[in-house]
């Protein structure tokens, strides 16, 4: 245990470097925050962000929604008034996520200040804001930034020894909301449990502490039940049985992995791009372990609580969805160890080594901020995505059903499955031709070929294929879909513009041709394009004329040889102003 004299001596020695270091670290931290806004306005929108936005529009449109992990939708219905363009709506949502990230930074600072200096606390927050994946994706429109902020408030509460019943109730509510927003909040449970056990063992009032933790736990359970019930009955939800099944399936899918370290590729990448971060983290862990035994820098209780934060790193070994965006969620509490590393360097290292540490590491963080906050968003911008969606709304000014990867046109009704790795694995496991079913029953008018899963439409041949360096880390060209779904897409859609395919048919006639029979699954007006006229069920259909076709079989023939195109819509608009400069999605 530290004596008062030891603490005073350490504080006085730390005061010598406090003003300058705090100023420099604060300036870098301010730059990192400014960078967040640049990233929000410029960086390419990820497929997940469109997916989360689509839940908001499903609530607005009164569509059925799975109540599992969709609690966030109640707070973002105002996005519909920001713009008709989904990219602009996501930018507005990203700005809200920045606020939550700033709140998370404040929680990290407050946690650090329980044991460490001001400079150490600022250094820890800077480490969090400078981590490469966090710079680019920490404030993206996902549920993670909200849940991270809420659970960090609760973690700060648990770390403190002075507990009150009011704080226990409030933090229980916040934790319940975090769990409703995303199930991955449960990954914090080992850290919470170890912290509670350490506090319980060393507290002088075990009965009082146990009572407050019991209130906290009960508050979580009661709040979760009440808020989930309100959420379920507010939305047009699926059956409660389906929701429970989704929850159990998600838990099994994400944690019950046969593969050890399922996202090693991204961690390996981080070891290279953020090597300074991981070195300092190891140093912080080492100082915490050392202090646990000699109690020089911090006492044993604090050391054990700080080491409990490292347990979250273990989730990388098992958690299936440890993609780059996950690191901002996982590393928030872990970054508290950076304050230990900073103060430990002042305490244990020589003046020369300490000076080297305090210059080189912040410099590496500065490089990460510039590269990931300015260079990456400048190279991978959202401009083409915004222009593409703007043209889609011009082509289809009224909402229609469609098929794509991730609900990119979020305000319209997407059909089919969410084409992430998880969604694709479930699709293959079920073996149900859901796309064929959607085409036959939901009248999807167009397809946005924004994933390699839709290569069957001939995206590669048109040289507009999407980047395969996404969740897979690379993939070979092949027919990804079930045979029935592939045939349904090829026989019902034709290329229209860039990555857009619309309902239609291409008919070939020779002079020897007799009657052809075609099947229309997607009803609506069709324009006949070509140099020849045809007979449709015995009636002349001249080139450039528009005719409404209902679902069903039709007999077609032509007196002349040639090719005609039946394209959905009345002379459907085709943009000439927007050129494709890149794929719609280029990966993380």
Positions of predicted regions on the chain:
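Extracytoplasmic catalytic/substrate-binding loops of multi-pass membrane glycan-assembly enzymes
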Residues: 40-55, 66-82, 87-91, 238-240, ...
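Loop-to-helix entry region of an early transmembrane alpha helix in multi-pass inner-membrane enzymes
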Residues: 74, 78, 86-106, 137, ...
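Hydrophobic, aromatic-rich transmembrane alpha-helices
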Residues: 104-108, 197, 274-299, 305-313
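Transmembrane-helix signature of polytopic, membrane-embedded enzymes
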Residues: 108-130, 148-149, 166, 303
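Membrane-interface transmembrane helices that cradle and orient dolichyl/undecaprenyl
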Residues: 113-118, 152-170, 200-204, 286-300, ...
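Hydrophobic/aromatic-rich transmembrane helices and adjacent perimembrane loops
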Residues: 137, 144-147, 187-188, 313-350
């Amino acid at each position: 245990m530290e004596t008062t004299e030891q603490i005073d001596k350490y504080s006085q020695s730390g005061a010598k470097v406090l003003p300058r270091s705090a100023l420099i670290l604060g300036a870098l931290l301010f730059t990192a925050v400014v960078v967040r806004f640049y990233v929000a306005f410029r960086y390419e929108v990820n497929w997940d962000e469109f997916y989360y936005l689509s839940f908001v529009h499903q609530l607005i449109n009164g569509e059925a929604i799975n109540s599992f992990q969709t609690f966030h939708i109640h707070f973002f219905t105002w996005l519909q008034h920001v713009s008709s363009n989904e990219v602009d709506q996501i930018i507005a949502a990203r700005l809200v996520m920045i606020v939550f990230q700033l709140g998370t930074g404040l929680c990290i600072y407050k946690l650090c200040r329980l044991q460490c200096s001001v400079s150490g606390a600022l250094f820890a927050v800077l480490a969090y804001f400078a981590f490469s994946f966090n710079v680019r994706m920490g404030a993206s429109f996902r549920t993670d930034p909200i849940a991270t902020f809420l659970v960090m408030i609760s973690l700060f509460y648990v770390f403190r020894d002075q507990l009150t019943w009011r704080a226990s109730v409030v933090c229980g509510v916040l934790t319940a909301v975090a769990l409703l927003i995303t199930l991955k909040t449960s990954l914090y449970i080992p850290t919470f449990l170890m912290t509670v056990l350490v506090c319980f063992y060393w507290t002088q009032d075990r009965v009082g502490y146990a009572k407050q933790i019991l209130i906290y736990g009960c508050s979580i359970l009661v709040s979760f039940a009440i808020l989930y019930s309100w959420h379920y009955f507010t939305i047009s939800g699926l059956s409660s049985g389906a929701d429970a099944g989704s929850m159990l399936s998600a838990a099994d899918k994400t944690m019950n992995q046969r593969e050890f370290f399922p996202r090693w590729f991204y961690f390996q990448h981080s070891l290279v791009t953020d090597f300074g971060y991981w070195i300092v983290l190891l140093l912080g862990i080492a100082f915490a372990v050392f202090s646990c035994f000699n109690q020089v820098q911090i006492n044993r209780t604090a050391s054990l609580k700080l080491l409990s934060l490292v347990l979250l790193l273990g989730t990388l070994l098992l958690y299936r969805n440890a993609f780059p965006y996950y690191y901002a969620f996982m590393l928030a509490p872990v970054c508290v160890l950076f304050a230990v590393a900073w103060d430990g360097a002042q305490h244990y290292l020589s003046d020369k080594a300490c000076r080297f540490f305090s210059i080189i590491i912040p410099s590496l963080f500065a490089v990460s901020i510039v590269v990931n906050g300015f260079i990456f968003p400048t190279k991978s911008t959202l401009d083409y995505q915004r222009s593409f969606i703007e043209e889609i709304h011009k082509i289809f000014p009224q909402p229609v059903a469609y098929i794509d990867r991730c609900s990119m046109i979020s305000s319209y009704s997407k059909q089919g499955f969410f084409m992430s790795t998880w969604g694709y694995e479930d699709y293959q496991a079920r073996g149900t031709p859901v796309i064929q079913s959607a085409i036959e029953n939901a009248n999807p008018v167009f397809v946005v070929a924004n994933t390699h899963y839709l290569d069957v439409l001939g995206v590669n041949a048109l040289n507009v294929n999407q980047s395969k360096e996404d969740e897979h880390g690379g993939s070979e060209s092949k027919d990804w879909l079930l045979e029935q779904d592939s045939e349904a897409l090829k026989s019902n859609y034709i290329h229209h513009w860039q990555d857009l395919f619309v309902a239609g048919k291409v008919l070939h006639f020779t002079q020897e041709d007799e009657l052809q029979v075609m099947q229309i699954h997607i009803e609506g007006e069709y324009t006949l394009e070509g140099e020849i006229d045809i007979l449709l069920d015995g009636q002349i259909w001249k080139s450039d004329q528009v005719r409404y076709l209902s679902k069903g079989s039709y007999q077609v023939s032509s007196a002349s040889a040639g090719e005609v195109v039946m394209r959905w819509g009345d002379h459907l608009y085709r943009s000439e102003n927007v050129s494709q400069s890149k794929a719609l999605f280029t990966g993380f």
